[in-house]
């Protein structure tokens, strides 16, 4: 299953970058799925939307970073996360990387 492979790749990234194993808590929803990561130095919530249904002005096949708090090197870690998604998202059919909120 594509979703499972994506989660495995994301968990591997988190393990290699931060040393956290199997950190992703995955929740299915009507649009795709969401991943919540709450670790000592990392607090992230990311939506993987196959179908946006017009919500939030996000296009279909979007990865939406809702929350990304890194205890150390926030800007550098966020750029690295974006690089990971830009490399891997085409493999799984995702076309857009977006952020939510922030005014």
For the regions a protein language model found, what residue spans apply to each?
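Non-catalytic substrate-recognition and accessory regions of acyl/acetyltransferase enzymes
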Residues: 1-73, 83-103
């Amino acid at each position: 299953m594509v979703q499972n492979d994506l989660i495995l790749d994301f968990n591997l990234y988190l393990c290699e970058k931060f040393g956290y194993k199997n950190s992703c808590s995955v929740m299915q929803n009507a649009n795709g799925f969401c991943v919540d990561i709450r670790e000592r130095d990392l607090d992230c919530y990311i939506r993987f939307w196959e179908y946006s249904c017009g919500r939030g002005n996000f296009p279909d096949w979007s990865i939406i970073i809702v929350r990304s708090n890194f205890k150390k090197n926030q800007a550098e870690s966020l750029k690295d996360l974006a690089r990971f998604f830009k490399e891997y998202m085409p493999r799984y059919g995702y076309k857009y990387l977006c952020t939510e909120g922030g005014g």
